Every structure is written in C-alpha cells, then in structure tokens.
Amino acid sequence: MEELQGYLEIDGFRQHHFLYPLLLQEYIYALAHDHGLNGSILSEPMENLSHDNKSSSLIVKRLITRMHQQNHFIISVNDSNQKGFVGHNKNFHSQKISEGFAVIVEIPFSLQLVSSLEEKEIAKFHNSRSIHSIFPFFEDKLSHLNHVSDILIPYPIHLEILVQTLRCWIQDAPSLHLLRFFLHEYWNSNSLITPKKSISFFSKENQRLFLFLYNSHVYECESVFIFLRKQSSHLRSTSFGSFLERTHFYGKIEHLVVVLGNDFPKTLWLFKDPFVHYVRYQGKSILASRGTQFLIKKWKYHLVNFWQCHFYLWSQPDRIHLNQLCNHSFYFLGYLSSVQLNSSVVRSQMLENAFLMDTAIKKFETIVPIIPLIGSLAKAKFCNGSGHPISKPFRTDLSDSEILNRFGRICKNLSHYHSGSSKKQSLYRIKFILRLSCARTLSRKHKSTVRAFLKRLGSELLEEFLTEEEQVLSLIFPRTPSHRPHRERIWYLDIICINDLANHE
C-alpha cells in the first residue's frame, strides 16, 4: 500500500490523475488475485502477497508485455487475421485486466476512506458495518412512523450510464475508455439476453469490478436523499465515507438549490418532515415516514421522476410498494418485520371510583419466515419441499466428526444470524431439520437406522447444535416464571454479510 500511495502522491498523478499506468505493474494483479473478489486491498501488507499456478508471475509478465506491444485494444471486425490483444485468449486476458482495473479504481477512494477515518477517529467502524445494527435503528424509529415503502432500485438501462457516473470521480480519460471497452465487450458477447441478465453475468465473471460500479450507481440514485435531507434540516448532515468528496458534487447541489428555490418553491415543503428514514441493503431499500398517505405518494412520484429524468432509469410502478405499517409486514435482510399494536390494560382508581384504561402500545416485531427458509434448506438438499429432513450426500472420505462439525456450523450460523427473532419457534424447527438431516446422513454412511444411531450418539449430537447464546442465555436473564427465553432478541455487531441460506430474495 505504501508503494501505491507513493505513486498516487507524485506530481504526475496529482496534475493529470492518471490511473492506467498501474495496469503495467505486476503487484496490481497480485492484489487482485490474493485478496479475492470480496477482499479489501487495505487488509494486508504488500509483502504478504503470493501467487499460485493460475495467476503466476510468468502469466502476468506475458500479459504486461502484450499490453506494451499492442497499440490498440479494439480489433477491426473485417480484419480477421489480426491477433491483437483480444484476439488470442480474449476472455482470460480481459478478465485479468478487469480484475486489476477494479483494484486500481478503488485506490483513490480507499485512501480517502482511511484518511477520513483517521481524522474522525472512528474507532467502532466495524460495528457500524454490521447488518444487525440496522434492526435496533428500526426498533427505535419505526414504532413512531405510519407508512413504509419497499423500494427496488432499478438497474441502469444502458451500461454507458455507469461510465458517465464515474466521470465525476475519475478524471483519467484512458481509464474511462478502458472501462467502456470492458463493458461493451461483455455486453456484445451476451447481446441476446436482457440487460439485467447481462449485468448478472458480468457480476459473476468480474464481481469486484461490478460491485464497485453498482455501488457508484446506487449512490447516485440515493443522492436525492442527501440533498433533500440537507435542505430539510438547519444542521448540515455529515455522511460517512469518501464518496461525498468528489468533483462537481457540491456544484450540483448549489445548482439544484437555485432551480428548486426559484422554479419549484413548494417542492421542498413536501420533504421537510424530519420523521423520514431511509435504509438500504444491496438493491432493496426501505423508506418510512410519519406523514400521511399523500406525503408518501409524493415521495414515490419524485423518486420515479428523479430516476427517469436524471439517470434515464425506467422504474416500474411495482418496484415501489406503499403500505401502512400497522397493516403490513415487510421482508428485509432475512427477517419479516412489522409494527404490532399490543394492548395494555391498566386499572386506575380515583377516590371511590375505579376504571380500566386500555392503552395501545406499538412494538417492533421481527420473525423468521419459515417457508422461505425451508425452501433454502430444500435447495441445499437438507430436506424436501415440505420440510421433511433427508440425508445430504457427502464425500465418503469425510469422517463422522467432520460431517458433524459441518452440520453444526451451519446450524450455529443460522441461529447466530436469526438471533434477533421475536419468536424462536421457527428456529427450533430449522435446528430440528438440520439435526435430523445430520443423523440421517451419518446413519446412511454407516448403513444403520436413524433410531440406533441417535441412541448411540446421544448427547454429543445435541451439544454440537447448541449455540453459544443458548448456553449463556440462562446467565444473562434470570430464571423467573414470567421469563420467556424464546422471545429474547439478541443483535450482534460482527455480522457484515447475510448468510446464503438466510437470503431468500
């Protein structure tokens, strides 16, 4: 990272913002390979990087040599005899360079992110990254709101929009041309499929580059919330991250202020209610408001028009659902969340008169949807479609302890992620399915019956599926007759990604 930062701080980069020369450096491809598709380029020092046979130094050197010798990327269609850069082993070379390019475009933002964290002294940055940190926010805010909107952020209708979005952040024209080449290369090779499937295919082949492009696209779509929030509050809000500090961003805000202030004086009034909250994970977002149905419909109208006019995105009406919180449950991050009205009867006595008061209290509830979760288990071959446990095929060379540990780890991960559920009955059923599926798998391996195997294994099978929170729950909460441990919710601040089995979307 010191070597990268040294290049970025030289006069040539500061004056011209050139990123493409980094494509000719071998360590870029080592970073792209060794840190994986989901890794961070800031997690390990340079000396810890290594190579394997597939991404050897010799292959990278040959690739760099071809880039030095090649004068252009795009080969003429009429000249079929040319063996240019993409003429020989095109897919492999394109994938390698796109992986390296993904690392390069992340560098300026990563350095700004590190500097902003050091300046703000954010010590609990990893806690704020946790998915579970969203649900305490829901508990605190949603019980006071009236309406909720489920929003699916639309995909860009053309890949050129992604390039135009990055023009505000990256002022290196050759790098933008190279990005445009990659996008059109994958688009042309999959021209017979829809744009959404094309983007999905692109994400599977070059996940790191796609995630960077998609996050930049989503951030642009969300820029309207930042602007409206700043206009509706006297205190200027400070957003986390380095994406706000980009070229022309504040210029755009000032321009929008002038336009809305002069031409649409009543528009900002619609958004001055401070009780509007917005939460997003991946491509799905939740917009909740305390206002009336009219206000939330105005939000929908302005969002659709903003996306269509500013980003040329066609947002279908069924991608934004408007519902009342008291009558609607929304699915988000593997939980089915809702706001329930719980009545509380209080007896009051004044002098000789006594009367009962029925008070309705709003409470935020989160439950685990059992049907989608059973569908995920059935897809992974732990049970059939009706939830009946079946034996899962494993390699014959695996020992009993390895099979037992794998089942136990899956069960603990699911229980760990869904520990915030208000009702634990669904989790008990999932654990029963996994436990019996494990017993069927082991009994099938030993050609025995499930009853005999469970009798022989005994408490060892039960302890393997017992989670840590169940072991310490009795120490945290007192044992009283009114205590109901199946309703206690526990949120963890170390979960930064959703479990594959828990993600039913």
UniProtKB/Swiss-Prot annotation:
Cited function: Usually encoded in the trnK tRNA gene intron. Probably assists in splicing its own and other chloroplast group II introns.
HAMAP family per record: MatK (MF_01390)
Family statement: Belongs to the intron maturase 2 family. MatK subfamily.
Record's keyword annotation contains Kinase: no
Taxonomy, superkingdom: Eukaryota
Main subcellular localisation: plastid
GO MF annotation, one: RNA binding
Pfam families according to UniProt: Intron_maturas2 (PF01348), MatK_N (PF01824)
Record's GO cellular component terms: chloroplast
Biological process annotations from GO: mRNA processing; RNA splicing; tRNA processing
Key words, A-Z: Chloroplast, mRNA processing, Plastid, RNA-binding, tRNA processing
Record carries keyword Chloroplast: yes
Gene label: matK
The protein's name in its UniProt record: Maturase K
Organism: Calycanthus occidentalis (Spice bush)
Localization: Plastid, Chloroplast
Lineage, broadest ranks: Eukaryota, Viridiplantae, Streptophyta, Embryophyta, Tracheophyta
